[in-house]
Swiss-Prot record:
One of its GO terms (cellular component) is host cell plasmodesma. This is Protein p26. It is found in: Host cell junction, Host plasmodesma. Keywords: Host cell junction. It comes from Lettuce infectious yellows virus (isolate United States/92) (LIYV). InterPro entries: Crinivirus_P26. Self-associates.
Length: 227
């Protein structure tokens, strides 16, 4: 059912020598979110007809971008990178539609997540924080660049990184208490050093999560990532 192997080829590689235009990346994200938003309430088959947009996005990111999944608030899958389009006769009219978009930059795997609300349409950070889109994008860029530099300085680029941006309508009291946190936990594996370390920064309705897998923090402390 997946008619777009060019997008979802897991063996695709990136030209890491190419300098990444972070403005282009941000513009690409908004472009993708606007496209998905325009399809809200229509059948997934309609989204299928717009996949050429994703092909162009992928090329603009030097072949590194792909959509991972499209699910609703009941975790019903409309699209998955390995299974292709599903439920093609369904209507996307559940409460919330979650979109994950991945781009790999300098060994950093960046996961963008947008939420589409049935009653309000797509809400991005500009809607939630009452800021113009350019200002919000710039703040995200600044945060990402600072965080990336600090991580590289501390532990280098030898690990697998994940950076999530998650727009939420509400933030739980527990999340607010965490505000900005560092933590690590052992996975249930035989390798005691197989850690999943993460940093979460909350700003009103935006949740940013930065995770990496490796041994320990490499000297990284909470003071290193406060901005």
């Amino acid at each position: 059912m997946n008619n777009f192997p060019e997008i979802f080829d897991d063996e695709s590689t990136c030209d890491y020598d190419k300098e990444i235009d972070h403005q282009e990346l941000s513009d690409t994200f908004w472009c993708l979110m606007d496209f998905i938003s325009s399809k809200h309430g229509k059948s997934v088959a309609d989204i299928n007809s717009g996949m050429n947009t994703l092909i162009n996005i992928r090329k603009s990111l030097n072949g590194s971008g792909k959509v991972v999944s499209i699910t609703d608030s009941y975790n019903k899958t409309y699209f998955h990178s390995q299974r292709g389009l599903t439920n093609v006769d369904s209507r996307i009219n559940i409460d919330i539609l979650k979109i994950d978009f991945i781009s790999i930059i300098d060994d950093l795997q960046i996961i963008f997540r947008g939420l589409i609300y049935k009653d309000k349409g797509f809400l991005d950070s500009a809607d939630l924080l009452d800021l113009d889109k350019k200002t919000t994008t710039r703040k995200f860029q600044e945060y990402f660049n600072i965080l990336k530099i600090k991580i590289i300085e501390k532990i280098g680029m030898t690990k697998t990184f994940h950076f999530n941006i998650d727009f939420r309508n509400t933030i739980s009291p527990l999340d607010k208490q965490r505000k900005c946190s560092i933590s690590s936990s052992h996975k249930k594996t035989n390798r005691l050093n197989d850690l999943n370390n993460y940093i979460t920064y909350l700003n009103d309705n935006i949740v940013l999560t930065f995770r990496w897998k490796g041994v320990g923090f490499g000297g990284l402390s909470l003071n290193d990532i406060k901005i």
